[in-house]
From Swiss-Prot:
GO terms for biological process: response to antibiotic. Its EC number is 2.7.9.6. It is an enzyme of class 2 (transferase). This is Rifampicin phosphotransferase. ATP binds at K22, R116, G131, T135, Q182, E296, Q308, R310. It comes from Bacillus cereus (strain ATCC 14579 / DSM 31 / CCUG 7414 / JCM 2152 / NBRC 15305 / NCIMB 9373 / NCTC 2599 / NRRL B-3711). The lineage of its organism: Bacteria, Bacillati, Bacillota, Bacilli, Bacillales.
Amino acid sequence: MSSFVLDFQEIEKTQLFLVGGKGLNLGELSNIQGIQVPEGFCVTTVGYEQAIGKNGAFQTLLNQLAMLKIEERDRIGEISKQIREVIMAVEIPVDVVESVAHYLSHFGDEHAYAVRSSATAEDLPYASFAGQQDTYLNVIGKENILQHIKKCWASLFTDRAVIYRMQNGFDHNQVSICVVIQKMVFPEASGILFTADPITSNRKVLSIDASFGLGEALVSGLVSADNYKVKEDEIVEKVIATKKLAIYGRKEGGTERKKIAPNQQKFQTLTEQQILQLARIGRQIEAYFGCPQDIEWCLVDDTIYIVQSRPITTLYPIPEVNDGENHVYISVGHQQMMTDAMKPLGLSFFLLTTSAPMCKAGGRLFVDATQRLASPASRDYLINTLGKSDPLIRDALTTVIERENFIKLLSDDEKEKDLSKNVPPASSQQQPENDPEIVTNLIKNSELSIEELKRNMQTKSGVDVLDFILEDIQQLKKVLFNSQSIAIIMAGMNASSWINEKMEQWLGEKNAADVLSQSVQHNITSEMGLALLDVADVIRPYPEVIAYLQHVEDDSFLDELIQFKGGEKVRDAIDAFLNKYGMRCSGEIDITKTRWSEQPATIIPMILNHIRDFEYGASKRKFEEGLQEALKKEKELLERLQHLPDGEQKVEETKRMICNLRNFIGYREYPKYGMIHRYFIYKQALLKEAEKLVQNNVLNEIEDIYYLTFEELHEVVRTNKLDYKIIHKQKNAYKLYEKLTPPRVITSDGEIITGKYKRENLPAEAIVGLPVSSGVVEGRARVILNMEDANLEDGDILVTAFTDPGWTPLFVSIKGLVTEVGGLMTHGAVIAREYGLPAVVGVENATKLIKDGQRIRVHGTEGYIEVL
């Protein structure tokens, strides 16, 4: 066995570093009984590394490439081209040339071969990289093959491969390349087999694409392919494409395109028997690798050859339940306005805090709704409740229920038992007294509890810290699920629903509660947005401080402020803001996310924008304007009601509900603020313990604790021992999860059920969502995916995936809101109503459909957006 060249049969599972992802998978496939793989061998990474290892020009250019940022596309292109030229000019090591000649004589010099790149960062379970390097078909002759080996080496530095590595965090120095030399087969048909449906992600449905000739035509998008769907050894769907072209190999080498005769273009590529045979092969390969596969196949004289198999890395993972039953899962992140992947410690804390049973998948949390959907008593309540906050979830759940036999409905006897335990409590129960002091007292009790936690935490160390946190989480749950607190929140929400329903019924006015909700008391989140305007007012008179803050890059700036006139006053104002709100950040329900207090420079761009866009005293003006609008709307509604039949009674009922709304609706944001405050205290204590673990050489980095569950961290602190494989495994998983888009609803088959909005009476080009804050507004769309990248001007419309309280400071600068995630009572909706901003949420793919800088019109009352 040569270290330069390995036959497919010689490749071992541990040799990724030698043969890359594609080569390793071909070696594995060759060892599966009954699977036909065209013969071939791999020119290992050793040959490539010897060829370029001592090349000074190559190393110099590689170092230059490593210094570039992904935005520098032109420079990346220039250096990548120079690297490719250097590689094409190198001599292939003699040992490689001799080994290739030996294997070619063994397999047949006269044969045609496919020459394929196989990078060490390709076809991995957590990063596909498919198609980033080059493939050459029907290459004949030793010298020709050697030249194409160099072309494959050079393709490691195509612009697309370099940029893809940069996007995925791979070091160019750490990636190597092998070249696969595989005997060509000349198929009548070829294509791609997915062992899970790539459209719906259903793991029980195989999807086969098939066309005539070589698969290159299909992969490169030259032809449409037949598509066959197979489920449980039965063909459940066939779409026969019009196939006008095919690519075939030429005897003298290379490939050629051929037109297909018109009378043959609609022929089915594979017979039913061949489709089912291919499906069985796919399931066999999937079982061997242990995960869904993307498989390239060829049909030659009734024999199916497999030329490649790689993991499908784009499928959303399924929550693990191994009971053989069907399950339906609902995303928690879509309700919490945080759909980012969470690290293991973040997931642990949220699971410890919540009262509802949840399961993990893809770095997110899901609730198993199966039992509640099976029960007539709870099904309608669940669907209607979720439907108010997210119509897409309601539509998806309705789709599942309408499928026969997917969810086992309860029998008549079970229905009787279920009625007694599953009927939700009536909303009239526990109606609180209409007294704003109740809210004041709840807030005061929460603040006292947090101060006590701070004092107690200072006395703990080691494993006692973790034990104490577990105890305190019970206290946190008592605060979060306090019956009086929940009653207050429900009273505010019910008042909002009542006002909207009755005002539309009696006066024909839609969403009247939106204006009435402006500038209410006790909304800790909207108060935070206004407080940052006040900080801007403190800084405004000091031009030296403003000039300094415009160039702040690290978090030591607070201590340096005192060298400027007004600097101490500015520092105190920022400190005061951080003392009250510094535990917040974007994605704050994940305890591992960096808080404003940990990185104060994060809030400086927002402050500078406020100084630029607003006059002194803007926070008080904004609050007063909102209050006057709300009072004016109340007066107008009551006057109109007075003239209706039973007007006096309607006025009294409405006044009471408006009072409920304005007294209670602001409090809805407070329990979460208390939870996040506690999380920050827990986090600070855990980071101190992590620092000790680093000092004791148990951890490499303090933030490695984020990749442990709470239970694992407890054990590490107790024993001072850690198997670092856990950290590496979770880091790789998190990298994958970050790239995935979580579904609102997913089944135990892995099928993603997507809901749809009703489009009646809307413009044809309208982008539809859920109306949550009334009004119509036109403006420049600013598509922002990370709050840190926000550069908003007064009057912009914010378009983003989701907003949570950490985004609130941006709301004072915008005049409209569009989000991909959200509901009537989620963060963005509540704050938009309070600030009087037209808003549409739950807009599927809003950040892709709307381009940054486009002028758009947001219809916050009707729930759609127009691109102008």
